[in-house]
Amino acid sequence: MYDELIESGDLPLARKSVLPGTGFFLPDTLEEDLEDQQTEAALEGADVAVIADPDADGLACVALLREAYDDVQNVPEPADDEADADDDASDEPLEDLEPTPHSVALIPASPHDVEDALARVAEYGDEGIDIFVCDLAPDRYEYVEEELDAALETADSVAWYDHHQWGDDVAQSVRDAGVDLVVGDSDEECSADVVYRSLEYDFNLMYEELAAVTRDHDLWLREDPRSDDLADYAYWTDPAEYVEVVREYGVDLPDWVQEYIAERRVEKEALIEQAVGRAELREIGGYTVGITYGRCSQNEVAEAMREQGADASVIVKPAGSASIRGTDEFDRCHEVAGKVNGGGHPKAAGCKPDIYDDMLDYANHWTTRGAVTKRVILDAFRDVIADAAEDPDEDADADA
């Protein structure tokens, strides 16, 4: 396949909006080999491994842990071509990761591959390493059981800090395995808050503010405009760079970062407009559900659908996943996601329905703007709403 067929950086906006990034098209084996190399390099000489979601919340956890362990700072310099970076990290998936000076290693992971990250740390980490898992939650214990056991054999200690919705059986199994698991209230705390209060370390005010502003975006409070800057910068830049920039500057990002964010937001807003323009509203069991498709910033698109009257919103992505956002009127997003291979919070969840068997299914996904994915997620809404109607006592217990 010609490289230009899968490089999306120079695509017209209308096409970029409906196609996934370059990383989607790379073979799993190629990515796995690279991730092995990157993890091995990151763990060389490291005393601590932090497996974290590479969003602003997960990366704030890494910054807090590096501060607590008095890790060396490696502050990046502004690059002349910073603003020329491609659309998102998935368009540059093969960037080599050289050994770093850090004794607290960052191992990025998504909710769908946390078990792979655990296995790599078990394989490449030194005996007696301390392992932290941050801002990630397994849907089922058996998904991580073997890999967690291997990590526990290698590590001196394993701590897991999170704020997502955990099943009681999953949490108990993780604790029974020997993990120090702390799960915060997803309506009150982000994962950075959990790390901040769990570590026996006297953080200065800069890190307290980092946790607070990160929470502002992660819980979608939107009371501090700096939280949008953190979220966008974390999404667009390299995770390692983000961690070191917020360690140096806190939440008041330097001018060169602000300029970079401002330039990237021009395209971000255009992609949001594309997705909002495709939005439809459906009535399901007394609730209005907004649904759309596109590569975009899901929170802003969900907010636009809420303003149009949606009680809940679904943003289906070209890669096959979807974001589900709720409101005070509908707070069962994690239940909907749980029916379609996902999970999350009552008002913010994600999923990737297990409906893609081959590339023809994905081709249909792109050309129909996610029609099948939309249908199965809307069916999940119907099931959740019907279940709630049959068991009103459960709602009363939840509100008590």
What are these model-predicted stretches?
Residues 52, 134, 161-162:
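Active-site flanking residues adjacent to catalytic metal/cofactor-binding acidic residues
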Residues 165-239:
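Short alpha-helices
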Residues 23-29, 33-39, 46-49, 74-154:
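N-terminal small/polar loop signature for handling phosphorylated ligands or for N-terminal nucleophile
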Residues 56-62:
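Short N-terminal binding/cap micro-motifs at the start of the first secondary-structure element
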Residues 1-27, 44, 270-400:
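Gly/His-enriched, cation/cofactor- and phosphate-binding structural elements
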